[in-house]
């Protein structure tokens, strides 16, 4: 049986009225910001269930918008998310949507970076500020954000994934969950891993030196705590 801490029950100290609709939403935005890896020019948020019904009144829209700008749920700037987005040239659109048989506090994001790259993420706020990520760039995942997440973009050829996992083995880092997606033309791929334990500071540099690796993104729990 899972043991619950006090912050799982009463939620974190935050800006806004609801840990599910504000703190959790801001954390979802922060996850998207980190795993997108670039500044965002446009964000479309497809709001499902209770998110769709109450996002304006509970500040869910501000929290999501703050998160993708790198603003935490306990930062007073969350209240100014729209003004800060306008200053940064960030366009945001919120669309009520039926995403199917998913958690009522679910949002699907389509982010377009300033370089024109498209990134998608779907996740839900499950209470007390906790979140669950269910999709990254079209890849089905189940990540909590409570363990480190490694995202790589690399060439789609033999040996690249082996090179990445060899580095993880060298640092004695265990892979808890792994998903890979290939591009339609077979030239590129992306990979998402949930890892166990703390990550050494030199890990990112070591992974970036692997043949075929084009980008390495690391999200640690403290980045969205």
Question: Which residues does each PLM region occupy?
Answer:
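A conserved regulatory-domain signal marking ACT and ACT-like small-molecule sensing domains
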Residues: 94-97, 121-225
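Generic secondary-structure signature for well-ordered alpha-helical cores
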Residues: 15, 31-38, 69-73, 87-91, ...
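Acidic-glycine-rich active-site phosphate/pyrophosphate-binding loop
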Residues: 1-6, 37-42
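C-terminal edge-of-domain segments
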Residues: 86, 91-121
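A structural-propensity feature for long, helix-poor, extended segments
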Residues: 44, 48-87
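Short glycine/threonine-rich loop-to-helix capping motif typified by GTGT followed
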Residues: 54-62, 104, 190-197
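Conserved phosphate/anionic-ligand binding catalytic regions in large, soluble enzymes, centered on
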Residues: 11-29
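Alpha-helical scaffold segments in soluble metabolic enzymes
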Residues: 8-9, 27-35, 63, 67, ...
């Amino acid at each position: 049986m899972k043991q619950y801490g006090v912050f799982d029950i009463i939620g974190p100290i935050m800006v806004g009225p609801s840990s599910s609709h504000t703190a959790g939403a801001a954390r979802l935005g922060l996850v998207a910001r980190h795993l997108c890896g670039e500044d965002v020019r446009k964000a479309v948020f497809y709001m499902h269930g209770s998110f769709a019904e109450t996002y304006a009144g509970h500040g869910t829209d501000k929290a999501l918008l703050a998160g993708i700008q790198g603003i935490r749920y306990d930062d007073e700037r969350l209240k100014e998310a729209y003004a800060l987005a306008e200053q940064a040239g960030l366009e945001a659109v919120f669309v009520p949507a039926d995403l199917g048989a998913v958690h009522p506090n679910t949002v699907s994001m389509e982010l377009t970076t300033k370089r024109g790259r498209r990134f998608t993420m779907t996740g839900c706020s499950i209470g007390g500020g906790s979140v669950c990520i269910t999709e990254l760039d079209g890849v089905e995942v189940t990540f909590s954000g409570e363990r480190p997440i490694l995202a790589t973009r690399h060439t789609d050829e033999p040996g690249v994934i082996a090179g990445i996992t060899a580095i993880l083995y060298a640092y004695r880092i265990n892979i808890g969950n792994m998903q890979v997606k290939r591009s339609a033309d077979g030239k590129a791929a992306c990979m998402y891993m949930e890892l166990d334990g703390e990550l050494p500071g030199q890990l990112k540099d070591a992974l970036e030196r692997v043949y075929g690796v084009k980008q390495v993104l690391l999200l640690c729990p403290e980045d969205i705590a």
